[in-house]
């Protein structure tokens, strides 16, 4: 074993592969952070749609969730990589394809978290808000969602961990994330054990840090309920 391959290529692996600060349009965090934010925002609308009284809103939101939770992420990535460019008549950059695929896919999971969070809020809260004269949309915005978000935080962090690890799948379309960066170095150095062990450690450190924070939040929220 020769771990000098790591130290000799640490700049490319970390700055390019993990942070996306190199010459390639890539980076694990550069993909994961926007995907988490945009996926959650879309998930809020989907989660609220799942609870809508109108079947014209509830049914499409339900079908969306059931469909994307029933197909593998890698298939969604391939759809955006091979099929969407054919429909548009032009090719798309790896980053756009990966980001769109992750946002669309993860929104289904974030939507279910939002739905469960909203349902965890006591019905009496909505009834009290209605009694004060608030409309349904105002009740959702000012009363239900703030309390629901508190209940969602641990689950949102857990799903974000899953998304962070899943970004390694973007390497199959040539997106230069941490996994792809290790593959590029390995093609030159032929040191798969050292390189992929390093990649695994980086993912583990990120996941462990986020999961530890999620457990801390769960304990804190349990001690200080809303």
Label every model-predicted segment.
Residues 1-226:
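Transmembrane alpha-helices and adjacent helix-loop boundaries
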């Amino acid at each position: 074993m020769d771990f000098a391959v790591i130290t000799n290529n640490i700049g490319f692996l970390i700055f390019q592969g993990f942070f996306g600060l190199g010459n390639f349009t890539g980076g694990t965090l550069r993909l994961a952070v926007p995907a988490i934010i945009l996926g959650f925002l879309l998930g809020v609308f989907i989660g609220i749609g799942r609870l809508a009284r109108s079947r014209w809103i509830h049914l499409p939101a339900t079908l969306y969730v059931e469909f994307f939770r029933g197909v593998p992420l890698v298939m969604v990535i391939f759809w955006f990589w091979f099929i969407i460019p054919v429909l548009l008549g032009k090719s798309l950059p790896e980053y756009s394809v990966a980001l769109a695929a992750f946002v669309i896919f993860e929104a289904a999971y974030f939507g279910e978290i939002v739905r469960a969070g909203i349902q965890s809020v006591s019905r009496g809260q909505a009834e009290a808000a209605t009694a004060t004269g608030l409309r349904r949309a105002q009740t959702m915005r000012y009363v239900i969602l703030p309390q629901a978000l508190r209940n969602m935080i641990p689950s949102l962090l857990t799903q974000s961990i899953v998304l962070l690890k899943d970004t390694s799948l973007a390497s199959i379309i040539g997106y230069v994330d941490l996994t792809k960066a290790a593959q590029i170095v390995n093609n030159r150095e032929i040191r798969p054990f050292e390189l992929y062990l390093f990649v695994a450690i980086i993912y583990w450190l990120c996941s462990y840090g986020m999961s530890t924070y999620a457990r801390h939040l769960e304990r804190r929220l349990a001690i200080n309920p809303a």
